[in-house]
Amino acid sequence: MASTNDLKNGLVLDLDGQLWTVVEFQHVKPGKGPAFVRTKLKHVLSGKTVDKTFNAGIKVDTATVDKRDMQYLYKDGDDFVFMDSSDYEQFHVGPQIVGDAANFMLENTEVIVALHEGNPLYVELPTSVVLEITYTEPGLQGDRSSAGTKAATVETGYQIQVPLFLEIGTKVKVDTRSGDYLGRVN
């Protein structure tokens, strides 16, 4: 149990048996009437977001979430297999839980897996990863880094926009939150 005054981003709440993550929160003290807390919550399993308002100071149920360092090993059918870095226990995680993180994971990628009562909830990636371009149209002579972008496919199969001068085999840094090209890696 926690008070609504203790809400912060990333906190997992248990509301009516469903797990929700606090994405945004704002304490509001109007001139008239009692204070309240306005929140934006994201459903842990479905990813759906809702706006919910709580009266200030009331108690809400929090869920115990254990975040563990894990390593992505391989894909087994539709499932992704992760290994706990501390005790080498392996977890099979479904594609609905991995979500968009699959676009940036290569074998042996270090990630954080959030567990609730031993069940995986979601996968957190580092903010950026280095991936190799496996396909892109050839650049034209005279292409400059500021001349525009073109589509490129990286080794995970994900497609990003890169500057025109980049070629197949180039390693690039990609932001895992937005999927944007951040720079070339030597």
Curated annotation (Swiss-Prot):
Main location: cytoplasm
One GO cellular component, as annotated: cytoplasm
Keywords: Cytoplasm, Elongation factor, Protein biosynthesis
One GO BP annotation of this record: peptide biosynthetic process
SMART domains cross-referenced by the UniProt entry: EFP, Elong-fact-P_C
Subcellular location per the Swiss-Prot or TrEMBL entry: Cytoplasm
Gene3D superfamilies in the record: 2.30.30.30, Nucleic acid-binding proteins (2.40.50.140)
Pathway(s): Protein biosynthesis; polypeptide chain elongation
Any one GO molecular-function label of the UniProt entry: translation elongation factor activity
Top-level taxon: Bacteria
Pfam families: EFP, EFP_N, Elong-fact-P_C
InterPro entries according to UniProt: Elong-fact-P_C (IPR015365), NA-bd_OB-fold (IPR012340), Rib_uL2_dom2 (IPR014722), Transl_elong_fac_P/YeiP (IPR020599), Transl_elong_KOW-like (IPR013185), Transl_elong_P/YeiP_cen (IPR001059), Transl_elong_P/YeiP_CS (IPR013852), Transl_elongation_fac_P (IPR011768)
Family as reported in the entry's similarity comment: Belongs to the elongation factor P family.
Primary role: Involved in peptide bond synthesis. Stimulates efficient translation and peptide-bond synthesis on native or reconstituted 70S ribosomes in vitro. Probably functions indirectly by altering the affinity of the ribosome for aminoacyl-tRNA, thus increasing their reactivity as acceptors for peptidyl transferase.
Name recorded for this polypeptide: Elongation factor P
Lineage: Bacteria, Bacillati, Actinomycetota, Actinomycetes, Micrococcales
